[in-house]
Amino acid sequence: VGLLGADFEIENGRYRIKRIYTGENWNPDLRAPLSAPGIQVAEGDYLLEVNGRPLAPPANVYSLFEGTANRQTLIRVNKTPSLEGSRLITIVPVASEDTLRTRAWIENNRRLVDKLSNGKLAYVWLPNTANPGYTYFTRYFYAQQDKDGAVIDERYNHGGMVADYIVNELDRKLMGYFALRDGTPSTSPIAGIYGPKVMLI
């Protein structure tokens, strides 16, 4: 079954797009069908047809997407539940929304930590302590190295190996600063978060 990376609700006797999950369309694991460049679909639009077949409750919204995963699929959408003024759009559904929904959860957590800490704390989720976990850590930790502390989230971690690399990075000690005459002072080591850290497990 092909999936659109979206939540739906029933309104005015039609399926309406309640939420569109965004991703990174250059990354095959985070491709989001409805947020790709040039796809003119918005939250609040109605999904009226799939490959020329009308879609309306009580039919299951996914029933018309059988066999469409990773295949060009024609959908008809409109801002109203009417065919008048609707538009046909070619999209490519994904086989799984897991990574899109997980990314949304991560980003919601990161924004919440940022808001509640007044921008002082970083948030890093680790899916495991294997290659994907190291990738997540490096990407999120160093992108927030200007923070005063960090929340490391180990919930739903799938296991792996002893995370000595991550432990070493978290345990880095601030040794000093470089004071530049015409620039921003930098730390030594250059990269790191040197303040308090907490882990959610």
Which ranges hold each PLM region?
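Short, small-residue-rich loop/turn micro-motifs
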Residues: 10-12, 19-24
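Structural motif
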Residues: 42-48
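Accessory interdomain/linker segments of ATP-dependent helicases and helicase-like nucleic-acid enzymes
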Residues: 1-15
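Cleft-lining beta-strand/loop regions that shape enzyme active-site pockets
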Residues: 1, 16, 24-34, 48, ...
